[in-house]
């Protein structure tokens, strides 16, 4: 089994406000694939497995949270969202109702669903909160008041 080698890439020319947002990407014919990396003292430290062309980029855009079928959420007793991020990818998501954690299920790579838990969720007014973070630490927060 091969172990990835570590490569240091000079990145002093990039002016950074958020050093966590910097990352290294592997260039292919059509795109730049996210590989991660850590900014340390003006250098990017990233694990690479093969020689090739790489690019240093900065991800400062927060993930996108898109509600799906919002008009039927209460009647169908579930919340559905599509999560996306244009560069480093979605790393974590957390759902809350009235400040309490609720478990969202990942249906596929980008769609999550919460089905109302009738034992924990009482009838009345509530607030849903969804927090999504990408691999560079950018965060989006979606809130939605609802009555059930």
Question: At which residue positions do the language-model features occur?
Answer:
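Short edge beta-strand/loop segments characteristic of extracellular beta-sandwich folds
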Residues: 7-11, 78-86
């Amino acid at each position: 089994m091969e172990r990835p080698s570590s490569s240091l890439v000079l990145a002093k020319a990039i002016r950074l406000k958020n050093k966590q947002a910097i990352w290294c990407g592997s260039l292919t014919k059509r795109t730049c694939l996210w590989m991660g990396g850590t900014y340390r003292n003006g250098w990017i430290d990233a694990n690479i497995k093969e020689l090739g062309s790489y690019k240093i980029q900065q991800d400062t855009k927060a993930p996108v949270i898109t509600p799906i079928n919002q008009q039927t959420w209460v009647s169908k007793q579930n919340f559905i969202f599509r999560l996306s991020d244009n560069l480093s990818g979605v790393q974590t998501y957390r759902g809350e109702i009235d400040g309490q954690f609720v478990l969202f299920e990942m249906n596929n790579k980008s769609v999550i669903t919460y089905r109302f838990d009738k034992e924990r969720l009482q009838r009345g007014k509530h607030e849903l909160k969804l927090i999504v973070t990408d691999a560079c630490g950018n965060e989006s927060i979606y809130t939605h008041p609802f009555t059930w």
